[in-house]
Amino acid sequence: IANIVKKVNKRIYFIIQLKRAHVSEADIINFYTTCVRPVMEFCCQVFHFALPSYLSNALERVQKRVLSIIYPLTAYADCLEKSGIKTLYDRRVDACEKLFNEIITTPAVNMDDHIPSRFFPNYDLRHSRTYIVPLTKTNRYKNSFFPSSARHINDNN
């Protein structure tokens, strides 16, 4: 994450230059979403569930800094609303859900050993789970993509 933040900080310099050149806020947001944010979101599905909160906050702090450059003297929540940008955490969750659903629904993917099996109860439950979450012996496997995604989908149903 430190290397990602370092790469992004180099690109933030260009945002400062665009702001000094009086480029419109919409164009700066467009530059941020096309050139800077993809660096922070690259392969985020792999590390999202294993990412400690302090590293997640470090990534979010970078986005907060960019938005404070574009919209000075404005609260972060207001900047997000003004620019139409979601928090990085929300985008990572959406990306993980999208990838998991793509893997589940694509029949050509041969990952039957890794994908948690679906749960079909014989009776109605108030909080039915969609997938059987595998038992894990280590935290590393517990926080990996498939068990965490299955747990996340079960919690949100």
Predicted regions and their residues:
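Hydrophobic/basic alpha-helical segments
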Residues: I1-N157
